[in-house]
């Protein structure tokens, strides 16, 4: 009986670490894809309207920072899940 309880707790701890690692990986992949799409769209917009390059670049940096902030929060939540 005690062995079964110990094995279940060990398995639960291992799955928690796996889940935290997968969550962090998905957050980073999502942020990379999002920032890549933002950069690509901004370059297309600058190619179409070179005179608006300053405004487009400013908006691109702000949106990329927001996407990166969401990814950072997701990684922090995964780390908290891992260690707490």
UniProtKB/Swiss-Prot annotation:
Where it sits in the cell: the answer is: Cell inner membrane
Q: Where are the transmembrane segments?
A: 21-38, 60-80
Grouped into one coarse class, the protein's main location is: membrane
Which residues bear the site annotation Reversibly protonated during proton transport? 68
Write out the GO MF terms. lipid binding; proton-transporting ATP synthase activity, rotational mechanism
- Fetch the InterPro entries from UniProt: ATP_synth_csu_bac/chlpt (IPR005953), ATP_synth_F0_csu (IPR000454), ATP_synth_F0_csu_DDCD_BS (IPR020537), ATP_synth_F0_csu_sf (IPR038662), ATPase_proteolipid_c-like_dom (IPR002379), F/V-ATP_Csub_sf (IPR035921)
One GO cellular component term, please give it. proton-transporting two-sector ATPase complex, proton-transporting domain
Its domain of life reads: Bacteria
NCBIfam families in UniProt: ATP_synt_c (TIGR01260)
The UniProt function text for this chain reads:
F(1)F(0) ATP synthase produces ATP from ADP in the presence of a proton or sodium gradient. F-type ATPases consist of two structural domains, F(1) containing the extramembraneous catalytic core and F(0) containing the membrane proton channel, linked together by a central stalk and a peripheral stalk. During catalysis, ATP synthesis in the catalytic domain of F(1) is coupled via a rotary mechanism of the central stalk subunits to proton translocation. Key component of the F(0) channel; it plays a direct role in translocation across the membrane. A homomeric c-ring of between 10-14 subunits forms the central stalk rotor element with the F(1) delta and epsilon subunits.
Q: What's the subunit arrangement here?
A: F-type ATPases have 2 components, F(1) - the catalytic core - and F(0) - the membrane proton channel. F(1) has five subunits: alpha(3), beta(3), gamma(1), delta(1), epsilon(1). F(0) has three main subunits: a(1), b(2) and c(10-14). The alpha and beta chains form an alternating ring which encloses part of the gamma chain. F(1) is attached to F(0) by a central stalk formed by the gamma and epsilon chains, while a peripheral stalk is formed by the delta and b chains.
* Protein name, per record: ATP synthase subunit c
From which source organism is this entry? Phocaeicola vulgatus (strain ATCC 8482 / DSM 1447 / JCM 5826 / CCUG 4940 / NBRC 14291 / NCTC 11154)
């Amino acid at each position: 009986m005690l062995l079964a309880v110990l094995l279940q707790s060990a398995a639960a701890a291992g799955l928690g670490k796996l889940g935290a690692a997968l969550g962090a990986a998905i957050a980073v992949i999502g942020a990379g894809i999002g920032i890549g799409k933002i950069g690509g769209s901004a370059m297309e917009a600058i190619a179409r309207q070179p005179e608006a390059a300053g405004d487009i670049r400013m908006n691109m940096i702000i949106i990329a920072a927001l996407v990166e902030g969401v990814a950072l929060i997701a990684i922090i939540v995964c780390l908290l899940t891992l260690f707490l």
